[in-house]
């Protein structure tokens, strides 16, 4: 199966659907992986890192791919690039996304990651809501610390503890 990882087009989105480490696992499982040129740059993954693990860099990750992995749902003309019988996995915001009917009319299967069960099960390690909320919370503390003009009282991190 060919798995395509296109560049994210949502303004401000700096994530990429797969890291070189993840791509290596997909290739080891027997899949072909194509990465759209520059797809990982905003997430600090250069094209050569993907090439080193066996991925092919392309100008169009949609062509020939049976499975598309994205962080955010495709919009507008991106949807038109999806061939019939393609499967796409992304965060779709399904309760507010007005373009979902287009996937069905093109015979495209869409899996909304944010609707995966959030229970103690095998799917828990794929729970994007908890993992992304955890990262957002961590980042918010770092941003607040950068803006705060004094030392935080008792800062505990993986690198150690700074007492007041």
Can you name each region flagged by the protein language model?
Residues 2-102, 106:
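An N-terminal-biased, well-structured beta-alpha scaffold segment characteristic
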Residues 2, 76-164:
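Glycine/serine-rich phosphate-binding loop and adjoining beta1-alpha1 elements at the start
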């Amino acid at each position: 199966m060919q798995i395509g990882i296109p560049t994210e087009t949502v303004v401000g989105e700096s994530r990429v659907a797969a890291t070189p480490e993840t791509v290596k696992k997909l290739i080891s499982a027997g899949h072909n992986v194509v990465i759209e040129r520059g797809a990982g740059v905003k997430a600090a993954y250069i094209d050569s890192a993907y090439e080193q693990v066996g991925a092919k860099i392309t100008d169009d990750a949609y062509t020939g791919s049976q499975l598309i992995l994205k962080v955010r749902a495709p919009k507008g003309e991106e949807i038109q690039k999806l061939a019939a019988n393609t499967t796409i996995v992304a965060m779709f915001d399904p309760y507010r996304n007005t373009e979902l009917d287009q996937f069905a009319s093109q015979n495209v299967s869409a899996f909304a990651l944010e609707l995966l069960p959030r229970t103690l099960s095998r799917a828990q390690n794929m729970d994007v809501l908890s993992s992304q909320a955890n990262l957002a919370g961590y980042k918010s503390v770092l941003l607040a610390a950068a803006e705060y003009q004094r030392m935080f009282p008792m800062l505990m991190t993986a690198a150690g503890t700074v007492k007041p």
